[in-house]
Structure formats: C-alpha cells, structure tokens
C-alpha cells in the first residue's frame, strides 16, 4: 500500500466500540431556537444506565452507529449530532425516564414530515439497550415550521366557505359502512344532510370495493349533497374518501371531486402515508377543496403507554403535512386526566401559540407562526345526551360526529339528524345565555325535547 492511501491509526482515529454517553450525553448543552427538541420516554434494559440509554437514542436517531468509524473525521460531528441534554425520572414509574434530545435543523429535509420521522423514530425503536421507547412530544422550531404549507385552508377559511359561524359543526358517518350500493349510500347521505347535519362521512375503509366503486359513490353523494343544499338553503359537505392504492389514483379521485363541485375530500393519513397526505394537501389548497383527515391505525402506534409515539406528535405532524379536520377522540366518559391530555393536543391543533404545560402532556412551548389551525373531530360512541359536555369541552371550533347517534334513531336518518341539530342549537343557546352546561346539561336537552318530537324520540 502506498503511503498516500494508507490510513494511520496514529492520526487520531481509533477503531472500537465506546459508550454513547461519552459523545452524545451533553447536560451542559444550551438548546438553540432552531433545534428540533424531542421528549422520549425511555425504559432501559436492566443494567443500562439512563444516561447511556438517552445518549443511545440521540446517537442512533442522528449521526451515531454502534462503533467508531474513520469517516467521522471527514465531517463535523459537533455540528450534526443529536444531543441528549437532560434526563429526568418519570414519577410513579420504575425504571422509566424522560430523555430530552436536541437535533440540529440541518439533519432534516425542508417540508418533509416523512424525512423528519425517518430520522427521529426510523431506526432507534428496535435498539437492544432499550426495553421500550415512546416519543412523547416534539418542539418544531419556527424555522422548520415555515418550510411547510400546513392545512389547505384552516379554521377561519373553512367557516367562510361554509358560511357557518358561532357553533360546532355536526357530522355523521354513514352506516353500515360496508355493503351498501352507491345509490342507497347516496340516499342515506341525503336523509342526514336534509335533517340538519353539516357533513356526512365516508368510513375510513370505504375506498373502491366491488360493491361500490368510488366514481359511483362520488356521483350519488354529490347529487344527494346538492339536493339537500337546495332544500335547506345551507352549504353541505360529504367527506369523499380519496384514499387509494397509489398517489396518482388518489389525486385522480380528488380531481373528480373538484370537477363535481363538492367542498371536501378525505384521506386516511397514517395508512396512506405522510408523502401522499402532503401531496393531497397541496392539491386541495391549489384547488379550493377542504381536507378531512381520518387517523385509522393510530392506536397501533400510540396506544401503549411506554412504547410507540403519542398521538400529540402525530397531531403536530398532521398540522405540518396538511389537513383541515382530524379525529381527536371524544373525552366524554373518560378519566379526567385523559381529558386534560386530549385537550392539550386539541389546543396544539387549533391554537397559534401553546405554552409548555406538563399537566396536559405538553412538554415544550410550541409556536406555529401563523400556520393555519385544524378542527378537531369528536367521534365514536356519542349521542344527544353527550351534546352539553361536548359543546363545553370542545367549544365552537370543532366537528361533532354522531354516526350511530344519527342513523340509529328509531324514526330514521333525517329525524336522527334533526335530533342532533336541535340538541346542539339548544346547548349553544344555553351556553350563550350563561347557563352551566356541565350541571344543567340534561335539563337543557329535556327542555328542547318538549318542542322537538325527533329529539324526544332520541332521548
């Protein structure tokens, strides 16, 4: 080997394995305004110190690998490495720690949620030194937020388009979700919209199956929507699910929806993927379509308390990728703690500036620098008796979705929709009069049912 090509160990490179914490655990580091900050819930394997576990997460999700490599000398590790800058034990849990990691902004492609997640959670979750790992929160710096388009329209533009103000919006998923022909499906849509709902919805798994192809469904739903609009004088929408097997097919369906003149389409953003979702969000902004987002598959990722990704992170990612509505749970009937946590990420979806508040699960102050907001959708097992609580908890900027609560009405879809609309209007009026919805909710619904036989039948 010639002297020019020989790599000499004496130059400063020393092969071999060394502890991650020697390089990647930096408690003296002061975070920069441009860093992406992550809070990981780390459960180390027995015998692994928390500092080593936290440093391992920082290393494996940035520049590190299991051994020292000579090519480290060709770049500036100090500039590009992730740093675990703080570790704290989780109160009430044995051998669980919150590890805070700072990533330099240069590690990420601009405007790509896909690249952000590939970097931060792509490889590290199978790491042997960890028994479990959960990404609890991310702080997205304004410099990175500004590289994203975000929601196609946002809350204010949606209200302007629909001409609906001063109350939550009402929706309903068409049931049975699978098996109806396109014409019968359209009929169910018409009945619900005619009765007083603002929106009806394709279920997340309604795409283009043999019993109902997407084009037929789009045509009959558009007919139902325009007929209900003509009868009621209100603007109506049906979330036409454009999710498909390829991005090209998805955009083709969105183009057809736009040509029909409908106001909104829908996407399953986790099963469809962030690349597809961002493409659709860009198309929707350019062509005046609202975009409803369903979170099918989220529980696979976020249900375990010590492993996976918390939904607040998936919600932040959706706001960056783009969507005007997203399902956010209901909180009705759940534990108080879960209510606070849910309202924490509801604020992260809607508000422009959210202060750090650990009691609500918000680990970092988040500034969205005027990125449009997303309407949270409450759906799943709710009915008219829940209306006072939902109106109080979610406020006006929300979509309340009563699927079985509408279609399960003993008199049919249209009376079910009437019952929901009357209950909502009664709760909004009572709230505006200063009444306590939490205490007087049942009385408010019963009062309204005296002059609405449809609501009385639903009660």
Swiss-Prot record:
GO terms for cellular component: chloroplast. Binds 1 Mg(2+) ion per subunit. The keyword Membrane does not apply. Mg(2+) binds at residues 201, 203-204. The disulfide bond which can form in the large chain dimeric partners within the hexadecamer appears to be associated with oxidative stress and protein turnover. The modification N-acetylproline is found at residue 3. Its main location: plastid. GO terms for biological process: photorespiration; reductive pentose-phosphate cycle. InterPro entries: RuBisCO (IPR033966), RuBisCo_large_chain_AS (IPR020878), RuBisCO_lsu_C (IPR000685), RuBisCO_lsu_C_sf (IPR036376), RuBisCO_lsu_fd_N (IPR017443), RuBisCO_lsu_N_sf (IPR036422), RuBisCO_lsuI (IPR020888). It comes from the Eukaryota. Its cofactor is Mg(2+). The active site is at 175 (proton acceptor), 294 (proton acceptor). The record marks 334 as: Transition state stabilizer. Transmembrane segments: none annotated. Residues 1-2 form a propeptide. The modification N6-carboxylysine is found at residue 201. One of its GO terms (molecular function) is monooxygenase activity. Substrate binds at residues 123, 173, 177, 295, 327, 379. It catalyses: 2 (2R)-3-phosphoglycerate + 2 H(+) = D-ribulose 1,5-bisphosphate + CO2 + H2O; D-ribulose 1,5-bisphosphate + O2 = 2-phosphoglycolate + (2R)-3-phosphoglycerate + 2 H(+). Heterohexadecamer of 8 large chains and 8 small chains; disulfide-linked. The disulfide link is formed within the large subunit homodimers. Belongs to the RuBisCO large chain family. Type I subfamily. This is Ribulose bisphosphate carboxylase large chain. It comes from Corynocarpus laevigatus. The lineage of its organism: Eukaryota, Viridiplantae, Streptophyta, Embryophyta, Tracheophyta.
């Amino acid at each position: 080997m010639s002297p020019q090509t020989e790599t000499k160990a004496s130059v400063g490179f020393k092969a071999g394995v060394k502890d991650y914490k020697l390089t990647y655990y930096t408690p003296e580091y002061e975070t920069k305004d441009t860093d992406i900050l992550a809070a990981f819930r780390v459960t180390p394997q027995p015998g692994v110190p928390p500092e080593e576990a936290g440093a391992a997460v920082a290393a494996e999700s940035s520049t590190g690998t299991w051994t020292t490599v000579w090519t480290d000398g060709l770049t500036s590790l100090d500039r590009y490495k992730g740093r675990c800058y703080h570790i704290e034990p989780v109160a009430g849990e044995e051998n669980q720690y919150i590890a805070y990691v700072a990533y330099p902004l240069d590690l990420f492609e601009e405007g790509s949620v896909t690249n952000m997640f590939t970097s931060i959670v792509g490889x590290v979750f199978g790491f042997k030194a960890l028994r479990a790992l959960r990404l609890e929160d991310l702080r997205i710096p304004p410099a990175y937020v500004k590289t994203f388009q975000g929601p196609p329209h946002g809350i204010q533009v949606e209200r302007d388009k629909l001409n609906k103000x001063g109350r939550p919006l009402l929706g309903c998923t068409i049931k049975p979700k699978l098996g109806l022909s396109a014409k019968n499906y359209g009929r169910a849509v018409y009945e619900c919209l005619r009765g007083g709902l603002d929106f009806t919805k394709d279920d997340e798994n309604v795409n283009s199956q043999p019993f109902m192809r997407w084009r037929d469904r789009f045509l009959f739903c558009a007919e139902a929507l325009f007929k209900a609009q003509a009868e009621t004088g209100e603007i109506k929408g049906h979330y036409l699910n454009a999710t498909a097997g390829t991005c090209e097919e998805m955009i083709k369906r969105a183009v057809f929806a736009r040509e029909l003149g409908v106001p909104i389409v829908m996407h399953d953003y986790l099963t469809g993927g962030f690349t597809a979702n961002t493409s659709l969000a860009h198309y929707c902004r350019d062509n005046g379509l609202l975009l409803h987002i369903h979170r099918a598959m989220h529980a696979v990722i976020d249900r375990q308390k010590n492993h996976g990704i918390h939904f607040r992170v998936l919600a932040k990612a959706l706001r960056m990728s783009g969507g005007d509505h997203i399902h956010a749970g209901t909180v009705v009937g759940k534990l108080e703690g879960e209510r606070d946590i849910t309202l924490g990420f509801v604020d992260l979806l809607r508000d422009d500036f959210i202060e750090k508040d650990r009691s609500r699960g918000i680990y970092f102050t988040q500034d969205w620098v005027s990125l449009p907001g997303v309407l949270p959708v409450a759906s799943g097992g709710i009915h008219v008796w829940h209306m006072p609580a939902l109106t109080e908890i979610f406020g006006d900027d929300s979509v309340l979705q009563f699927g079985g609560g509408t279609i399960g009405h003993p008199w049919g879809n249209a009376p079910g929709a009437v019952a929901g609309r009357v209950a909502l209007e009664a709760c909004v009026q009572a709230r505006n009069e200063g009444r306590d919805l939490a205490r007087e909710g049942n009385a408010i619904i019963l009062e309204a049912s005296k002059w609405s036989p449809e609501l009385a039948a639903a009660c």
